Amino acid sequence: MLLYTYRSFDMELPTVDIKDADYIILGLPFDGTTSYKPGARFGPVLIRQATLNLESYILDYDIDIAELKIADAGDVALPVSIEDAIKVAVETIKEVRSINPRALPIFLGGEHSMTYPPVKVLEPKSYVVFDAHLDLRDSYQGSRFNHACVARRIHEMGVKVAIFGVRSGTREEVMFASQSGIEWVHARDYNFDAFVDLVSSLPEPVYVSIDVDVFDLPLVPETGTPEPGGLGFWEVIEALEWLTKRKKVAGFDIMEVSGDRLGNSTSITAAKLLFYVIGMSAR
């Protein structure tokens, strides 16, 4: 067991030791800066529980992910303070990478502020994020590491940022994006060609973040800041399939899964997304 981790719930998948894995799953259960609907700290365990409902065989790829070398490293025991949580998450991710630097890491959240630690450790050149929100505030509710600021903090690392499925933001965020060369696509304007046009020129490796609020609301009612008018499941899958075939991926995360009951539609959607991400990465 890693220094700061614990096992919350076993997935419906056989797992291997971290050192032997091709894919490593790590939960980041934190919702300390949530501004509307708390519960994202339960996201990792809810996703794992939802895997009980799913077949491990991916029809689309003729791949059974139960036959792959997957390690579940557990969940990181994160402090309540966002600054302290970031420090512990960074230290734990570094420990995982020291054991196995070649495996593809997949992080389960947890609010979107928890995307910052993986990006800090993995140092990608580009950040592709599916999100209903721009998350480009400089500060929110007294913190520069609030979930509403994560894309801005990542941009400040010198990482190229591209945001898809947006339908919420402030005038200041839109102006900052324009002035800073940050590309984003409104959910109303999103299509596969728009995604390809923007992502084709991004430098590698790419870190991919999926805030589940990017999906249309009936799919993901249990999330921290829900918004109507989102993308469909297959729209996101199609984009990820293209990206994983053509770009080197540094890591993935699935963030902002919330709720307080087993089998809610948000956690099932996220678990299915997790299985597809693993399957498409193994093609």
Swiss-Prot record:
NCBIfam families recorded: agmatinase
Assembly behavior: Homotetramer.
Cofactor: a divalent metal cation
Binding site for a divalent metal cation 1: H112, D131, D135, D211
Residues binding a divalent metal cation 2: D131, H133, D211, D213
Effect of pH on activity: Optimum pH is 11.0.
GO molecular function terms noted in the UniProt entry: agmatinase activity; metal ion binding
Activity modulation notes: Inhibited by putrescine. Activity is not affected by arginine and ornithine.
One GO biological process term: putrescine biosynthetic process from arginine, via agmatine
Pathway assignment: Amine and polyamine biosynthesis; putrescine biosynthesis via agmatine pathway; putrescine from agmatine: step 1/1
Family: Belongs to the arginase family. Agmatinase subfamily.
Intrachain disulfide bonds: none
Protein name as annotated: Agmatinase
EC primary class: hydrolase
